[in-house]
Structure formats: structure tokens, C-alpha cells
């Protein structure tokens, strides 16, 4: 009898709690005016096409950018009220180098970290002093204090235990080392005593251009890369691969340990490609439905046309083949940021199909669906099949400018916890200046071109 009465009382309590929670949620929603569907955050520098970043947690959206006066800036948008707070990091963009991308991340304590505005120049890094407060971001500080004089390609990621990681290149194109740092509450520490990739090979300078450290379904981090001999893009050679459980001990696909730093001689070669063969450093890595790594890259075919190739690990052997049959040849030469004529995302599995988002002059922007066995293109679909984009108000680009779209990603929260999706948009001049100051004598738009930075919100259907 007591058990039955206890069960009844428990059921009543649970019902009351559920009703209270529902009422509280409705009350919170009622108090939460929310954001405008198109919220102007700031005026930004648009004379160079450089990558900004944006993320959200449960309370705020953070956007990093270069403001109209070229200062590295961070905006904090309150998701409940739409209020925008901004701060400047003590670092000013030169205005032309598209390498000077910006990256953001939240640590386990929900403090924001930002890095950017560097190309073979001193490391620029700042972080919040406390969660949810912009204070602290204005001051540039060192991470480790060593190998931070010539930094490029900042990249935040997560270790297997959720701790924040940071990767960057120290040195120059064709002569650079790759380091990994790890953040604990006490601060940053160098994760490996030696760099991941070597800056020299057989007394010649080299530099690895690598993918992100991608967590695979097998519990390993996977990475693919190309080597470059010097500043010129045509000196890229060889597609390579390695994996690691902890980002300290690295292996080839057979499980053999590769000592650090990895060199062209010790690396596992996936596809041996000589210089001047159309191999660019926009290499990508994904996985098929069986969890096998698939590397996407460009190179010339036997006729000299540029094709999208895939390399897949099958029964311990890398099988490589062209996925496309294009007639177009893309053969960029020299140094500096190159305007992308062929872009691709790397593969992913969606609804049991292996797909990849690709843009190329002959076909435009498409989502390519691959045959699982041959890896050939089976179908070409709309680009929205890859990832449906939030509705964005159409705004005509100023003459000579191009649109930029940055998806706001989730951090320290799951996608299902949000009823909205967000993107950030702005206009910039195209990446056609090879990181050099522009000649403005007869320009269609001024060289000090600026644009509104707009946060677009799309409420998801229930």
C-alpha cells in the first residue's frame, strides 16, 4: 500500500515539475524578444576576401571580423534580447593579405578564445578572463612563448577528452614547422616536444599543407597533406596520410609508428605526384559509410585537364581514381592567395550516400553523389542537398564585390538544443590581388571598401 501511495505521490510531483518546467520555458520564451531576422552587427573591412568566424553557445553568438578601421574585433550577440556588445583586440589588419584568417573557440569553462591576423608574423591570441564577458579579449598574449614569431594558419580543435587544442605553422611557406598546443585551466602547454611536420628534407626546405586533424569513427585522429618546396603553389608534391589516437604518437595506415617530425622520406605516400602536376593544397579528408578514410584532391589527368581525385584505403591499400571527367584545366602559378576556380568540401555520408559539395566552371555549384564501389559521380544534385542553408535576405552585391557567408556553428551545446540557425554575411572584393595592395586608379569600387556585417536568423520548423 505504501509503495502504491509513494508511486502516486511521485507521479503527481513529476507532473507538477513537468508543468512548471513547461510554464517556465513558455515564460522565458515570452520574456525573450529574440533577435531581428537580419541584425546588422558592424561595418567591416571588405577590401580583402579574408575568412571571419562565428559560433554560438546557449546564450550568445560570437562573431570575429576586421572592422571598418581594420581592427581585429569580436561581437557578442545576446540570443534573447538581440543586444550587441563589441570589443577590439589590440591587433590591426594590414588590409590585403587573405591569409590573415580569424578563428574562434570556447573552452570547457565557456571562455572565448580568438586568434588571427598573422602570416609568418607574431602570434596574435587573446581570450576572455571569465565566461560570458568580453573583458580580456582586448589584450594580445602569448600562448607558450616559443616558436611564436612567424605564425600562420591558426586552427582550434578538440582533443578526445574535450580539451581545447590549437595548431599553427611556425615559419614560412616551403620552410615551416607545425605545432600543437593544449589548453587546460592553468593555461596552454606544448603537446609534443617536436613539431608534427619537418621544415626540411634532405637539406632542402619543405612545408606540409595539411587538413584539419579529423576524428574518425575508429577513435583515431586522421590527417592528410601535401608537401611544398617553396612559396610557389606549383611546387606542391605527393599526397600523404597519418593517424594518431592522442596527437603525440603518429602511425601510418598499417599501424607502424612514424617518428616526429614527419618528413617526405618517412611519410606514408598515398599518391606520388611530382611538382607542377596540378596538385594544390586544398586537400580534404572524410570517411565513407564503412568508416574508411577518403582523401579528395586535384591533379591533372593524362590529357592535362584538372580532375577531382579520390584516394580511399581499401584492405590496407590506397586506391586512387578520378571522380570527374572535366575538360577544364586550372593551373595556378606563383605565390599569394589564389582565387579559387575549383572548390570542394571533402566527402561525407548522408542518408546512406557518399556526397561532396563541388564548384567548378563547367558545372557550377553541385552536390555530387558517388557510386560506393567505383567512387565515380553517379548523380549531380543541388548544392543545398549538402547542407540546407538558412533563408537569407537577398541583397544585391555592390559593383565589383562578392558575397561571403559564414555559418554560425554550435559549441558547448548540441544542435537540437537550438530552435534557430544562423549565418553571417558580408561583401568583399574578390581574392584576386594575391595579398598585395590593390591598384585603385580605375577600380569599380574604392580600395577601402567596407560592408555591413549582418547576422541572419532562421527559426526552424517544429
Q: What residue spans do the PLM features occupy?
A:
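Extracellular, repeat-based ectodomains that mediate carbohydrate processing or recognition
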Residues: 26-462
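Sec/Tat signal peptide C-region and signal peptidase I cleavage site
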Residues: 20-26
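Bacterial N-terminal signal peptides
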Residues: 9-19
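Bacterial N-terminal signal peptides that target proteins for export
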Residues: 1-11
Amino acid at each position: 500500500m505504501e509503495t502504491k501511495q509513494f508511486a502516486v505521490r511521485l507521479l503527481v510531483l513529476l507532473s507538477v515539475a513537468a508543468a512548471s518546467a513547461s510554464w517556465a520555458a513558455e515564460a522565458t520564451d515570452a520574456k525573450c524578444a529574440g533577435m531581428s531576422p537580419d541584425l546588422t552587427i558592424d561595418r567591416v573591412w571588405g577590401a580583402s576576401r579574408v575568412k571571419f568566424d562565428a559560433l554560438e553557445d546557449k546564450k550568445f553568438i560570437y562573431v570575429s571580423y576586421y572592422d571598418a578601421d581594420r581592427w581585429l574585433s569580436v561581437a557578442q550577440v545576446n540570443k534573447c534580447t538581440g543586444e550587441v556588445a563589441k570589443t577590439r583586440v589590440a591587433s590591426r589588419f594590414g588590409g590585403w593579405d587573405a591569409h590573415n584568417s580569424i578563428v574562434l573557440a570556447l573552452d570547457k569553462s565557456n571562455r572565448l578564445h580568438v586568434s588571427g591576423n598573422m602570416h609568418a608574423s607574431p602570434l596574435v591570441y587573446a581570450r576572455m578572463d571569465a565566461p560570458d564577458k568580453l573583458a580580456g579579449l582586448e589584450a594580445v598574449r602569448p600562448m607558450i612563448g616559443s616558436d611564436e614569431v612567424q605564425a600562420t594558419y591558426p586552427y582550434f580543435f578538440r582533443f578526445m577528452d574535450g580539451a581545447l587544442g590549437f595548431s599553427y605553422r611556425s615559419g614560412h611557406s616551403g620552410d615551416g614547422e607545425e605545432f600543437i598546443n593544449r589548453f587546460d585551466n592553468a593555461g596552454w602547454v606544448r603537446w609534443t616536444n617536436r613539431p608534427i611536420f619537418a621544415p626540411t628534407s634532405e637539406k632542402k626546405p619543405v612545408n606540409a599543407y595539411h587538413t584539419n586533424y579529423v576524428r574518425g569513427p575508429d577513435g583515431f585522429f586522421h590527417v592528410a597533406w601535401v608537401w611544398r618546396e617553396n612559396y610557389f603553389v606549383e611546387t606542391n608534391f605527393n599526397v600523404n596520410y597519418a593517424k594518431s589516437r592522442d596527437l603525440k604518437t603518429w602511425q601510418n595506415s598499417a599501424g607502424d609508428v612514424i617518428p616526429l617530425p614527419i618528413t617526405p622520406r618517412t611519410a606514408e605516400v598515398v599518391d606520388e605526384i611530382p611538382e607542377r602536376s596540378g596538385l594544390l593544397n586544398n586537400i580534404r579528408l572524410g570517411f565513407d559509410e564503412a568508416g574508411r578514410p577518403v582523401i579528395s584532391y586535384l591533379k591533372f589527368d593524362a590529357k592535362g585537364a584538372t580532375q577531382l581525385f579520390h584516394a580511399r584505403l581499401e584492405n590496407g591499400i590506397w586506391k586512387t581514381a578520378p571522380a570527374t571527367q572535366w575538360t577544364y584545366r586550372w593551373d595556378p602559378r606563383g605565390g599569394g592567395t589564389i582565387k579559387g576556380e575549383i572548390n570542394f568540401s571533402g566527402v561525407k555520408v548522408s542518408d546512406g550516400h557518399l556526397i561532396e559539395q563541388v564548384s567548378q566552371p563547367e558545372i557550377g555549384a553541385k552536390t555530387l553523389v558517388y557510386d560506393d564501389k567505383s567512387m565515380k559521380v553517379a548523380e549531380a544534385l543541388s548544392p543545398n542537398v549538402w547542407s540546407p542553408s538558412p533563408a537569407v535576405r537577398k541583397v544585391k552585391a555592390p559593383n565589383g564585390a562578392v558575397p561571403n557567408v559564414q555559418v554560425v556553428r554550435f559549441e558547448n551545446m548540441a544542435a537540437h538544443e537550438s530552435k534557430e540557425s544562423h549565418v553571417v554575411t558580408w561583401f568583399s572584393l574578390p581574392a584576386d590581388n594575391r595579398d598585395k595592395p590593390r591598384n585603385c586608379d580605375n577600380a569599380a569600387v574604392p580600395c577601402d571598401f567596407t560592408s555591413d556585417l549582418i547576422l541572419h536568423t532562421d527559426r526552424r520548423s517544429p
